[in-house]
Amino acid sequence: MQPDPNPAAAPAALIELTGVSKRFPGVQALDDCRFDLRAGEVHALMGENGAGKSTLMKILAGVYQKDGGEIRMDGRAVEIDDPRAAQALGIGIIHQELNLMNHLSVAQNIFIGREPRGRFGVFVDEDKLNRDAAAIFARMRLDLDPRTLVGRLTVAKQQMVEIAKALSFDSRVLIMDEPTAALNNAEIAELFRIIGELRAHGVGIVYISHKMDELRQIADRVTVMRDGKYVATVPMAGTSMDAIIAMMVGRQLDTEFRTPPDTSANDVALEVRGLSRGRAIRDVGFTLRRGEILGFAGLMGAGRTEVARAVFGADPVDAGEIRVHGKTVTIRTPADAVAHGIGYLSEDRKHFGLAVGMDVQNNIALSSMRRFVRRGLFLDARQMRDTAQSYVRQLAIRTPSVAQPARLLSGGNQQKIVIAKWLLRDCDILFFDEPTRGIDVGAKSEIYKLLDALAAEGKAIVMISSELPEVLRMSHRILVMCEGRVTGELRAADATQEKIMQLATQRESTVLS
């Protein structure tokens, strides 16, 4: 596939990266990569997690320094040694984790460290500070009071403040990393409107996202990376999503919805009755069988995560009974749950489930250290390493070695490490809370296959997901919640997105099947 459909007619690049390489200890993160951006365009950057997208953009933003290659702006070679150099060139980046101070006003956040001063240069000129912020908002056609404390804003409004901060440096290049991850549909529409305003002013936007439908709406071109290498640049119009996915993963993905096995005769592994906690969980009951994937669907705040955390002993309950393999058990702490063979993979794996500063080996062994202790005193380091390597092979975890820090792995591989941890604990009941959040399409496919394989081995799985196609693809049965209650149950063969949404927005229980 050609890098550009018609290079001769293409306008001059605002910024151009060629032959860029970057190496970290044990990892070639980038190898001979290229990318260009034109004024007034939205250029999507896509690839599986670990493909090198963020590394390439961090080099452009001055966070990392390249080992080789060239960066040109307006046709002139430039060196970007640090973020200040990038800002001086008019390059801004909006990180997925926003970098704002809640106790300061909007205007103070925008101009922090660069506040206009009064006559004697001692005191901040608050009037000018607020006027300058208002001028940027006028350019964005955004109605936002510069005096408002950032901590009082929604995530969407805070993101607009980050964009305004970047524009305050007269940014001509704006890098957006997964900007809609925490936004609802109305907020996404507002963000796209702002992007349209920026394009009209000639700002070039690099847009990193896994959401194909969004890119269809706003991207002009898309560059695909794979394994730290450049694959292709194609126009978004006229390029199918299947073609882009194939470029991203280097293979065709199995995206067909499969017919789930009949597990209705299997033994019941987990039974929950009358589970309640305030208004968050209200008289919830369900059964889960061996070899079954039970999908939990519902809108944000429906109570799905709360149920999982309650069963796992992470949160107290007011009432309810839990039976494991037919026996009533008492679960007051996660240790109690694990002792009964229940594992929980949190939706926030980086804070709950993964020690990102530790290596792969120690993360896998973290919850099972006792089995590696010899004579009550010494860790059997060799057995721990061999066990970790066995799970790395079994789950196809992509890592140079088990000594690699977990923070350097992609989201999909981090998720596999957490799964390995619970498999090592011999958990046969597993709660997966948003198991594919923040990972790319290729890694999602691998997680799906892994869940299917675990179910085929007899593991009993609850999968909580906000992505309806994912729930429909993976579940053998689907439980729907609304406002803390189970409002319905659907067999996989009868389930549709429409039926799920009907149940997710009603307050009374029913069964559609």
Curated annotation (Swiss-Prot):
Its EC number is 7.5.2.11, 7.5.2.7. Keywords: ATP-binding, Cell inner membrane, Cell membrane, Membrane, Nucleotide-binding, Repeat, Sugar transport, Translocase, Transport. It is an enzyme of class 7 (translocase). It comes from the Bacteria. ATP binds at residues 47-54. SMART domains: AAA (SM00382). InterPro entries: AAA+_ATPase, ABC_carbohydrate_import_ATPase, ABC_transporter-like_ATP-bd, ABC_transporter-like_CS, P-loop_NTPase. The keyword Translocase applies. It catalyses: D-ribose(out) + ATP + H2O = D-ribose(in) + ADP + phosphate + H(+); D-galactose(out) + ATP + H2O = D-galactose(in) + ADP + phosphate + H(+). GO terms for cellular component: plasma membrane. Its main location: membrane. Pfam families: ABC_tran (PF00005). Residues 15-252, 263-508 form the ABC transporter domain. GO terms for molecular function: ABC-type D-ribose transporter activity; ATP binding; ATP hydrolysis activity. It is a peripheral membrane protein. It is found in: Cell inner membrane. CDD domains: ABC_Carb_Monos_I, ABC_Carb_Monos_II. Belongs to the ABC transporter superfamily. Carbohydrate importer 2 (CUT2) (TC 3.A.1.2) family. Part of an ABC transporter complex involved in carbohydrate import. Could be involved in ribose, galactose and/or methyl galactoside import. Responsible for energy coupling to the transport system. This is Putative ribose/galactose/methyl galactoside import ATP-binding protein 3.
